[in-house]
Amino acid sequence: MLMLSKTAGAIPRPPRSNVRGFIRRFNVQPRALFHHKLVLGIETSCDDTAAAVVDETGNVLGEALHSQTEVHLKTGGIVPPVAQQLHRENIQRIVEEALSASGVSPSDLSAIATTIKPGLALSLGVGLSFSVQLVNQFKKPFIPIHHMEAHALTIRLTHKVGFPFLVLLISGGHCLLALVQSVSDFLLLGKSLDIAPGDMLDKVARRLSLIKHPECSTMSGGKAIEHLAKEGNRFHFTINPPMQNAKNCDFSFTGLQHVTDKLITHKEKEEGIEKGQILSSAADIAAAVQHATACHLAKRTHRAILFCQQKNLLSPANAVLVVSGGVASNLYIRRALEIVANATQCTLLCPPPRLCTDNGIMIAWNGIERLRAGLGILHDVEDIRYEPKCPLGIDISREVAEAAIKVPRLKMTL
């Protein structure tokens, strides 16, 4: 599990020669007349270097992304200094590609939006330092972006979704349920008490040595689990969902990881193989842990919907559940959430898979949303700092727990 600093960070000094070269290349007069507001979004919160230009109507004019997945697969996880160096090596190129694809010069931009919280400190610093130099050079407003708010609002780029709506954000670094009441108003109903589901699935995949599996060698851990689980029998092993007696909307995945690890150790002894070799029962284990994860996410989400309905926080006639984040691309988990949505008369919406994972489009779009609402637009960036740890919205999880809502049993026929 990656440990993040709890304090806001000063901006590291970037390689100025590269930025100057970038500025010289784009320090030209606007090449076209744009009638809409334009925002450049920059994302470096973890291990993806991404940028995009989006206009106020939601058109994506240009985008670019550099993924570090293959590098970190070899090390068994994200190494922050390595991620930082790769961001430094690629950020100029990625921003240039996004601008070039869009036909937009920095002079055409209405603002520059960049993720400054939460995330890996070393990674956040790279994006922020590069952005600050662009802001200062081209005299553009700066819009600091909360990474999880951007994930939550991405759905409004692809669908006509009004406020309020419920969002489940599930990824390798986050797991939370929140009610989105406006562009900047969030009520946190529950969150992971330990690790995120994507992190847990990655750890299980590493413990199963799926990188050595011929079908999974280039996949992330979560993708490998989903792929292998299709060949497995989830009934072969009993892995129970966590926190079944806790009547809140919080999550926990550490216990699920430990139970699975013990099961793998037991099967290794039973099959007479050493740690690091692939079990004959790997697919069955993958199927069982995926099912337990899906059931855990579904039950907490079910309770969140019931709470919002009881408190009249969601419109009964037009209730929407949005699921986003990297784990939202897991179709098995999505089917479990569809069962919950159908049982509660909610509409389940998910952004396209490429917008569920980290990307520059969601950052630019969040910038557009804030620009239109006149929220968080800075003209002085001298004191701006990144924040590796930053909660989402107002935490009302205690109120949810005190309601002690009993969730009716649903048949998870997946």
Curated annotation (Swiss-Prot):
Task: List the EC numbers from the record.
Answer: 2.3.1.234
Per the annotation, which location comes first and is thus the protein's main one?
mitochondrion
Q: Which residues bind a divalent metal cation?
A: 147, 151, 358
Its annotated compartments are: Mitochondrion
State if Magnesium is listed as a keyword: no
Q: Name one GO molecular function term.
A: N(6)-L-threonylcarbamoyladenine synthase activity
Intrachain S-S bonds: none
Where, in this chain's numbering, is substrate bound?
Answer: 169-173, 202, 222, 226, 329-330, 357
Q: Per its database record, what is this protein's job?
A: Required for the formation of a threonylcarbamoyl group on adenosine at position 37 (t(6)A37) in mitochondrial tRNAs that read codons beginning with adenine. Probably involved in the transfer of the threonylcarbamoyl moiety of threonylcarbamoyl-AMP (TC-AMP) to the N6 group of A37. Involved in mitochondrial genome maintenance.
The entry describes its oligomerization and partners as: Monomer.
Question: Would you tell me the protein name for this molecule?
Answer: tRNA N6-adenosine threonylcarbamoyltransferase, mitochondrial
Look up and give the organism this protein is from: Rattus norvegicus (Rat)
Gene name on record?
Osgepl1
